[in-house]
Amino acid sequence: MPKSLSVVLTATLLLIATSTQAGLHSHAPWVASVTTATERSVSLWSELAAIEFPAVAPEEVWVRIDLKRRELALFQGEQRILTIPYLAFGTAGANRIRLQGSSQTPIGDFRIDRINRQSRFRLFFGIDYPTPEIAHEAWQSGILSDEDYHDYRSYRRRNGHPPAHTPLGGHIGIHGLGNRPANLHQIRDWTEGCIAVTNTEIQMLERWLDVGMLVVIR
C-alpha cells in the first residue's frame, strides 16, 4: 500500500473514532437519565427497607400513618394492601405527648378502641391516646400531677379506655370530612389532632378497621 494512502486511511480511522466518541458524549443526557432512574429505584427500595415494621403476625391487618408523607397505608403483616395518598392532621403539627387543646396529633403506637358510626365526620375510629406508656412518661416529666395520673389510671381501669379530661386530652382518631369540602385535607391541615381522610376513603376503610387494630403514627 502506498504511504500516502496509508496516511489517509489512518487519518480516516482516527476521525471515525473521534466522531464516535463525540457521539457518545452527545448522548450524555440519555446516560444521565438512566442513572437517575436507577438512583430513583434504589431510593425507593431504601425507603421501603427503612419502614419499621411492628411485631405483628403475618396475617394481622394494621394501619401505618406517615405524617411526613401525608399518607395512610393499610398492611397485612409486611404486605401493603392499600394506600391513601393524602390526609390532614393537627393544625399545630405532631408530638409524642399531645396536650389538651394543643391541636397536635400524637405520635406512637395505638389501638382502635371505639367506633362511632353516627359521627359528624361520617365515621370515627377512636384510638387509645393517651396510652399508659405516654401517661406514665407525662407523669414522670411533670406534665401530669400525681392526682392527674391517679385519675388517668383509675378511669382507664374502670372503663377500659383512656379519659379525655386530663391535661393530655383525648378523643383522637381517624375520621372523614363530614360536610366539609372534599378537597379540604389536600389544601391544609385542619383537625384538632385527629387524622382526616375523605368520606369515600373512610367508608372504604370501614371494611378493614376494627376495635383492637394497631395504628402506628410516625
Features from the language model and the residues they span:
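N-terminal pre-domains immediately preceding structured catalytic cores
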Residues: 2-218
